[in-house]
């Protein structure tokens, strides 16, 4: 007898665009400009995307996930900014807020989960690179229980 159901967050509970260069990141750009980065926003975002792509390819081979702190440590080193001088947690919050701005819950997902919760234990899995983003989105979409 089935007692529980697991859901993957991205692509199952929400609709999202996994690309990282299709929208603007003005606050992320400003935070890095405040630390002396003199790239325009698009060049900066392309640089972040290149680091992400490299980490994703490495993760496919190693089966080890990475964090936003890992990404921004490499990005900052590439930009010759000491990562120890930057609040990586705040930078990750800023970047993931901008990246996730267009994420939407699938239609009627709240109702579906409430109905399923009456009979099953529900669980969530995700391989996110920044757990606070998932917590924030669950709250925003009223998917917490």
Predicted stretch roles:
Residues 1-2, 119:
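A short, charged/proline- and glycine-enriched loop
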Residues 2, 143-145:
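Local beta-strand N-terminus motif with an aromatic residue
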Residues 2-105, 131:
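N-terminal helical cap/lid subdomain that shapes the substrate entry/recognition surface
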Residues 36, 80, 119-120, 142:
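Glycine-centered loop/turn motif at secondary-structure junctions
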Residues 88-105, 109-141:
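Substrate-recognition element of Asp-dependent hydrolases with the DxDx(T/V) motif
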């Amino acid at each position: 007898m089935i007692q529980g159901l697991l859901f993957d967050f991205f692509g199952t509970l929400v609709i999202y665009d996994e690309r990282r260069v299709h929208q603007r990141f003005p606050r992320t750009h400003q935070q890095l400009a405040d630390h002396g980065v003199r790239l325009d926003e698009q060049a900066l975002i392309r640089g972040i995307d290149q680091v992400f792509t490299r980490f994703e390819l490495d993760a496919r081979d190693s089966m080890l996930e990475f964090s936003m702190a890992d990404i921004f440590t490499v990005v900052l080193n590439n930009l010759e900014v000491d990562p120890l001088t930057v609040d990586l947690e705040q930078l990750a919050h800023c970047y993931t807020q901008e990246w996730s701005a267009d994420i939407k819950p699938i239609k009627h997902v709240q109702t579906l989960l409430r109905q399923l919760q009456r009979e099953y234990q529900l669980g969530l899995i995700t391989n996110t690179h920044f757990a606070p983003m998932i917590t924030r989105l669950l709250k925003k979409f009223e998917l917490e229980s």
